[in-house]
A protein has these predicted regions:
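A short secondary-structure junction signal
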Residues: 142-149
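Short hydrophobic/aromatic beta-strand micro-patches
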Residues: 68-70
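Conserved catalytic core of two-metal-ion nucleotidyltransferases
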Residues: 4-6, 12-38, 81-141, 158-204
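A contiguous, mid-domain pocket- or channel-lining segment that forms the substrate-recognition surface
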Residues: 150-157
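Active-site nucleotide-donor binding segment shared across nucleotidyl transfer reactions
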Residues: 32-65, 74
């Protein structure tokens, strides 16, 4: 893909956006290579599917790629991820991070890049340019079982959200404390420097 700025459907596509798209396409090609090797089913979803059919590529204002897999194939991908995705690729899940990840699906990221989404500024995880790999789970046909499943998912989601919120709040407080300490250290350093200059000029 050339990196020249252009306008599509009245929407300006910058060279920077195209460079992100190129990295994401590289990620997709690597993922498809692994899926083909292990006979795993995967397909485009959401805006990526619309863009592929309607726009023969990206939706002009889109900035991500959404792929989806069935649970069996997704679990097989997880099992081979450590062996298949070496640098510059990073296969990210809740199990690959020491800090809370905050997603129920995997993301394939590119080392040496940065893509910090709004609200993720304080997350201490890999934040490289990425593509999303969603998973489709089966739903029970029995309505009672379906309701119970929905309630369990909602409960887990609230617990995870609360843990994430607590971690973000704590991280913000720590960052504020560090900045405060650094400011005090700089102030103390400036005071010492001023005192040194003053007394060095005073005749004793």
């Amino acid at each position: 893909m050339n990196l020249e700025e252009e306008t599509r459907c009245g929407y300006l596509i910058t060279a920077k956006m195209k460079s992100v798209w190129n990295i994401q396409i590289d990620l997709v090609q690597k993922l498809l290579e692994v899926c083909k090797k292990h006979d795993l089913r995967i397909w485009a979803d959401s805006g990526t599917l619309i863009g592929t059919i309607r726009d023969k590529g990206y939706i002009p204002w889109d900035d991500d790629i959404d792929l989806v897999m069935m649970r069996d194939d997704y679990d097989k991908l997880l099992a081979v991820s450590n062996a298949e995705f070496k640098s510059p690729y990073f296969f990210q899940t809740a199990y690959s991070e020491h800090a809370p990840y905050g997603h129920g699906h995997a993301q394939l990221r590119m080392n040496g890049t940065t893509a910090i989404l709004h609200g993720n500024e304080h997350m201490n995880i890999h934040l490289g340019i990425f593509i999303d790999i969603f998973v489709l789970d089966n739903f029970p046909e029995n309505l009672n079982e379906l309701n119970n499943m929905g309630q369990s998912i909602e409960k887990l989601h609230k617990q995870l959200s609360l843990r994430m919120l607590n971690r973000v709040i704590i991280t913000k407080k720590i960052n504020v404390m560090i900045r405060s300490m650094l400011m005090k250290a700089e102030l103390y350093r400036d005071m010492l420097r001023t005192m040194f200059l003053f007394y060095s000029q005073v005749e004793i």
